[in-house]
Amino acid sequence: YTEDSKIIDVRKEGEYAAEHIAEAYSRPLAYINTWIKDIDPKEHFFLHCAGGYRSMIAASILQARGYRNFTEVEGGFGKIKLTEVPTTDFVCQSKL
């Protein structure tokens, strides 16, 4: 990881809005068929979700469509939070 790394966050929009890697792009797994065409097959990127399951699904879909230019982050955002990777401040998404 470097500050110039491209990061794709496949969590739901609300999860991303609550807290995310500072430079990550929100691309929910539910809409992968919409955003997959925007991926540059020559540019490396990191792929993550909350814990690893959704990014594993996204990785399988990407690989099935010929993409090999990514690294799936094992453990997802939970593990990322334990590192020095900069994240946004948490914003509660619950409304009373």
PLM regions: where:
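Rhodanese-like catalytic fold shared by cysteine-dependent sulfurtransferases
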Residues: 1-96
